[in-house]
């Protein structure tokens, strides 16, 4: 879609919805993910939807703790809650399913006017099988663990368990069947299949059945998809044969679970990945083997076509590495979703870069109100008794979401049209540029509100960022925090930027822009200075002189 047409399309897309509005009890189309020229959108109630979410802590999805999960959405200005569904609870007795907790979460989500993404903690949770029911854990002959290269049993499920696969398929299918009837409002917009599947403590399974298959030939569809010559796993993949074989075993297992659920209710399904270092990946064994890490993305796509996307869980705070992960998972055939990221303050500003790279959703982990903190990655203030309430503890994320949530639908529609750019402050580079057809947007960090004779020094901490939407060839929607935004014409070095109008305002529920004041004078003479907090949105019209 051309930028000039975007404003018209935006109004049509948003006539009936605000970004966090929960649907009424009427028929709504099933959420889906659409692709337009390799730009993606999650469609909810027939319109593009940007997921500004958070994930509950692993043990928070119990009724006694609902009051510490769903109220966090309002504090954060989030429109989506991610929460686990525990196989061990759903099927405590084999063949008998209890979805009362799921129903309770749906009711809570509707009451708090948010959508949900459910996480099926089935065969895998972080490489282990700790959420399988007790009747599975107690029968290890029928439901075996993986055996590693030293012949030792490790705390990771073997894919060579037809009984466990069958049980997982039935359990996940039962969940999706229940959602089909229990959620006509489409409160649930996506479902994650398993959680960070892979192997810790080994490279691949060495059980006799696995050894037999490893000695066999690589499946033809994988060879063809990767453009390789046929042969055994060792012949085709060499030093990476063990890890690639394990990835195929896991991916084909997950595909059968996903397909069983999708046959019941075709919501968008995805898997999440525990990452290896995107710049210095190391050897297999230093990261979760067989997982949907960057080198295995194409394999998982081939093996598991029932999945809508493969998503990275990003717990790497360094700017260069964070952006490298986004580059690895943002593909022409893989929508970008960040379903987990760290909850330390440094992670908050990455929402700007994620949206600018076309993400359909962003969700920090563990931002409920239980005061639990995964200290290696998390906000220590979660458990700090001196913190002044949940608003203080969640403030870095709430600050950015407060700006973005009112325009979440607009951003989603603009991203589908390819008209969004965004960036997050890099502590090593205090200026950044964003490219549009006729203009370059110039971002500077650490400048005062007045004057252009000072060199940008960066913010401390580096928490700035901006998102810019092209509304036309010379018109932009600008939002951000702790950043100065200016524009440079691209095709005539003799020309300089001139602001025709800088309007501060907001969109109403129908997508119509409402101006509250016009910026000029000190507010525009040195570019557009956006504070470290606040919800200022600017509609900017440009020309040259």
Language-model regions, residue ranges each:
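Bacterial N-terminal signal peptides
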Residues: 7-15
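N-terminal carbohydrate-binding accessory modules
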Residues: 21-79
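Short, acidic/polar
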Residues: 59-75, 285-303, 321-322, 348-351
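Aromatic-lined substrate-binding rim segments of carbohydrate-active enzymes
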Residues: 65-140, 250-266
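Catalytic-core region of carbohydrate-active enzymes that cleave or remodel glycosidic bonds
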Residues: 114, 256-267, 295-400
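Polysaccharide-binding and catalytic clefts of secreted carbohydrate-active enzymes
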Residues: 142-299
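Aromatic- and carboxylate-lined catalytic core of secreted/periplasmic carbohydrate-active enzymes
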Residues: 352-489
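C-terminal beta-sandwich/jelly-roll accessory domains of carbohydrate-active enzymes
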Residues: 441, 445-466, 474-545
């Amino acid at each position: 879609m051309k930028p000039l047409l975007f404003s018209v399309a935006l109004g049509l897309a948003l006539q009936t919805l605000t970004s966090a509005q929960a649907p009424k009890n009427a028929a709504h189309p099933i959420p889906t993910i659409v692709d337009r020229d390799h730009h993606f959108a999650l469609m909810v109630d027939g319109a593009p939807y940007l997921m500004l979410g958070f994930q509950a802590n692993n043990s928070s999805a119990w009724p006694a703790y609902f009051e510490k999960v769903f109220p966090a959405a309002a504090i954060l200005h989030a429109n989506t809650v991610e929460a686990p569904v525990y196989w061990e609870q759903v099927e405590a007795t084999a063949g008998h399913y209890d979805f009362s907790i799921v129903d309770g979460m749906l009711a809570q989500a509707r009451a708090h006017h948010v959508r949900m993404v459910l996480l099926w903690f089935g065969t895998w949770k972080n490489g282990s099988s700790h959420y399988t029911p007790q009747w599975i854990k107690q029968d290890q002959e029928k439901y075996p663990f993986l055996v590693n290269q030293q012949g030792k049993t490790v705390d990771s499920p073997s894919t060579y368990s037809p009984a466990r696969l069958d049980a997982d398929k039935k359990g996940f299918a039962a969940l999706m069947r229940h959602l089909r009837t229990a959620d006509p409002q489409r409160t649930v917009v996506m479902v994650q299949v398993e959680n960070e599947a892979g192997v810790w403590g080994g490279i691949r399974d060495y059980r006799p059945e696995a050894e037999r298959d490893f000695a066999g030939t690589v499946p033809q569809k994988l060879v063809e998809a990767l453009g390789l010559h046929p042969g055994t796993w060792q012949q085709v993949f060499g030093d990476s044969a063990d890890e690639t074989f394990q990835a195929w075993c896991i991916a084909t297992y997950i595909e059968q679970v996903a397909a069983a659920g999708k046959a019941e209710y075709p919501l968008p399904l995805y898997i999440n990945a525990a990452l290896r270092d995107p710049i210095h990946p190391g050897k297999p064994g230093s990261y979760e083997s067989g997982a949907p890490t960057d080198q295995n993305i194409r394999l998982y796509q081939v093996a598991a076509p029932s999945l809508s996307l493969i998503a990275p869980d990003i717990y790497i705070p360094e700017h260069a590495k964070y952006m490298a992960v986004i580059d690895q998972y943002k593909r022409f055939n893989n929508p970008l979703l960040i379903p987990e990221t760290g909850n330390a303050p440094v992670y908050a500003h990455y929402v700007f870069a994620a949206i600018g790279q076309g993400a359909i959703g962003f969700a920090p982990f563990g931002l409920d109100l239980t005061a639990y903190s995964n200290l290696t990655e998390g906000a220590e203030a979660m458990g700090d008794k001196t913190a002044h309430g949940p608003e203080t503890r969640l403030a870095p994320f709430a600050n950015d979401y407060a700006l973005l949530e009112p325009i979440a639908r607009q951003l989603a529609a603009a991203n589908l049209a390819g008209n969004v750019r965004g960036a997050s402050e890099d502590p090593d580079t205090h200026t950044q540029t964003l490219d549009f057809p006729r203009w370059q947007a110039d971002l500077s960090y650490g400048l005062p509100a007045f004057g252009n004779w000072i060199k940008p020094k960066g913010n401390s901490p580096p928490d700035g960022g901006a998102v810019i939407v092209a509304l036309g060839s010379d018109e932009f929607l600008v939002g951000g925090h702790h950043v100065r935004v200016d524009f440079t014409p691209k095709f005539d070095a003799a020309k300089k930027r001139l602001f025709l109008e800088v309007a501060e305002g907001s969109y109403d529920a129908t997508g119509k822009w409402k101006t509250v004041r016009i910026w000029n004078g000190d507010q525009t003479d040195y570019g557009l200075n956006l504070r470290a907090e606040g919800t200022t949105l600017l509609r900017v019209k440009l020309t040259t002189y």
